[in-house]
Amino acid sequence: MNHTIYTDTEKNAIRFSNFKQLEASCAFTGLGVKYVAAGEEIYYANGKKYKVKVGDYIIGNEFTKSLVQINSAEAVQGLCIDISSDIISEVAEFHDVNGSELKEFLLSDQFFVNRYNVKNTSLGYSLHEINQKIKTGVFSNDLQHNELFYSLAESIITDQRFVFEHLTNLDFKKNVTNEEVFRAILHAKLLIDERITE
């Protein structure tokens, strides 16, 4: 089951999914977030495999070519949020000290598709909170204005600005090498964060 919670003419959307079995192409609109609330989803995005477990999410944009697979005895629940390119552009331009470089990074084929954990990002708290409100049926009041999507865009840009700044400082000849080294650094940071919180 894929249930649309909210959609508007500006291409902002929130959907809640609940599947045991699924294999389908998975489009990202504007800047899209796929959050796993229960179970595990496997994404193949731009030729790379991501196991997205409960509490994790993946971010992509319109250039991200993706396939999702779910194969579980228990229901796998997910939250899909699309934030329009216009909102991302507006918020990125406000935060970008280097002209349009951050906006270009976020909305082009240069975007760094990756899996993140809600505990380690600005966006994570919002995703967890939205999911809880949807499950308890108290979410509709938050959708009176576009403020929610601007707030989510702010969180994404806070997180992705860190990624952008560090990724552009890596100086390997191939972009793929920069991305793999940075993924390894992020994974090491995640392991350290998990050990500290134990």
Regions found by a protein language model. Give the residues of each.
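A short, Lys/Arg-enriched amphipathic alpha-helix from helix-turn-helix/homeodomain DNA-binding modules
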Residues: 118-124, 128, 146, 165-198
